[in-house]
Amino acid sequence: MKKLPQFVAAVAAAALVAAPCALAQTPSMQHSHDSPPARTSNSPLIDKVRAATARFVDVNVALHEGWVPGTPCVSGPDSGAMGVHYLLLRRLFDGVLNADEPESLIYEPMPNGALRLVGVEFIVLAADWASKHPDGSTPAVDGHLTNYVDAPNRYGLPAFYELHVWAWEHNPNGSFADWNTQVSCDRQAPQ
């Protein structure tokens, strides 16, 4: 559990530094004004996620509601990207997974500095899940099993379970794959 305080401190520090900067930018620099693509889904989970997160197409709404930048844009060497993860810390540490309440919103940085909502990630720390589910069950979100990520990991988190849902951007690898080849960190505006 030594890693958890370090992670919390890192996220808190990032939030203190990034949130004022993000709020100081004009709304046009902070989110895309393009309407989200009209889309129908064969997945009730994707439909639930879209309904629950539609207001966060504008990242300023997420910031106002307490979401904080948790990662820079995460990309893979040949697998596309995940994007920038914004976290709601009270959900991250509650040991619960709820289809209407993702722990992370995922945004793709755009060349003009805007952030475009592309998906969500459900995250539960393994120890928190185990304490509430001593039967050893694997966490699931609306019947979709999560992936286990052991520690140490690139995020500095203790072991956790996660499930990506690409509700706002088509993923050729599947709506629940970790990496999305349609998402890129290469298009972000120079810092």
Identify the function of each model-found stretch.
Residues M1-V11:
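Bacterial N-terminal signal peptides that target proteins for export
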Residues Q25-Q191:
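Primary mode marks residue(s) on the alpha4-beta5-alpha5 output face of response regulator receiver
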Residues P20-A24:
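Sec/Tat signal peptide C-region and signal peptidase I cleavage site
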Residues P5-Q6, A15, M110:
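Hydrophobic alpha-helical context, especially transmembrane and signal-peptide helices
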Residues A9-A19:
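Bacterial N-terminal signal peptides
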